[in-house]
Amino acid sequence: MQTAVSADNASPAASLGGETGPVLRTEGLTIRFGGLTALNKINLEIKRGEIRAIIGPNGAGKSTFFNCVTGVLRPTSGRILLDGNDITGQPPNLISRSGIARSYQITNILPNATVLENVRIAAQSRRHGWSMFRHYRSFGDIIEKAEAALAAVGLAAKADELASNLSHGEQRNLEIGIALATEPQLLCLDEPTAGMSAAETQDTSQLVRRIAKDLTILIVEHDMQLVMGLADRISVFHHGEILAEGPPAEIQSNARVLEVYLKT
């Protein structure tokens, strides 16, 4: 594993005043597919303003956990609470409107729409549901919010371009902008730097650090250097369970974690 960054580069979780209670909490979260237990009694808390990373070998349960939290999969047992409210088993659209947004491992945009339209539709769905046939200019501040989301991810100058014309790195950042437009409490990023060049990865790392000033972020990522440089805390999944949890420096020196990674 790479050397952890200094505390100066950490997210501002500790500076958000008294609001440090958990935004997300899972209690005994379990999911089974036939005889396979993909998640086994996961108890996890993510504090407000925190950047939490989930790492682990392939098949460890990382994506399954993401899919449970965002409503793609319904858990077999256990609970998921967002800001103390039970959202267990709710469909993705309701979970999104409750305050959880996500990006996907595979780029998920509307390629034949403009960059602004991609983000505007997301902002509109958060405020008014999927009322696509109403003229969007009747939605007051929707465009303003969409433009603010584009500015946050560095794409304001490309608002009128087709999304298909963006580079791969820009398309991944557009996905983050789409998520931001829904005004989430918790932003879930599923391998946000997958397929990126080193320069694009660095740009995305800086972007995540910027937007973390106002958000709680949950990230699944295989790039250990990126994880160690961004995360406040890391949860290590293995065989559907949490093997270890702690700040980056602690995880880097954890003998059980090192053993798992050396075996893979």
Named regions from a protein language model:
Residues 2-264:
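Glycine-rich phosphate-binding loops of nucleotide-dependent enzymes
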